[in-house]
Design a protein with these regions (language model features):
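Terminal leader/tail segments of proteins
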Residues: 1-103
Length: 103
């Protein structure tokens, strides 16, 4: 199932916008299509290697990171958070500020 089809199941009457994450803060020239941003109403999701890894809500200004997975995905997350106006310095800081502890 394509990512857009998956999101349409959860947001059936919403306009879904999908775009590539382009590096502004990272030294890379491109993420080569491996990082995508999906915007649906007030929700913004980061997809890295076809996995939802982070999201934030524009209204509540709350961001959450699911997991940092790999070094490359961490770079995608840092870029996404920075472009969205959030602090993103180190893996430790991101995990502390944006990941929920699992009991």
């Amino acid at each position: 199932m394509e990512i857009k089809e998956l999101f349409q199941k959860f947001y059936p009457n919403s306009n879904i916008s999908i775009m590539e994450l382009c590096p502004c803060y990272d030294s890379a020239q491109s993420f080569y299509g491996k990082a995508k941003v999906i915007e649906i109403e007030n929700d913004v999701f980061l997809i890295s290697y076809n996995t939802i890894v982070a999201f934030y809500n524009r209204e509540t200004k709350i961001a959450e990171v699911v997991d940092t997975y790999s070094a490359t995905t961490l770079r995608h997350i840092k870029e996404f958070l920075r472009q969205s106006g959030f602090k993103a310095e180190t893996k430790k800081q991101i995990e502390r500020d944006y990941m929920k502890e699992v009991a």
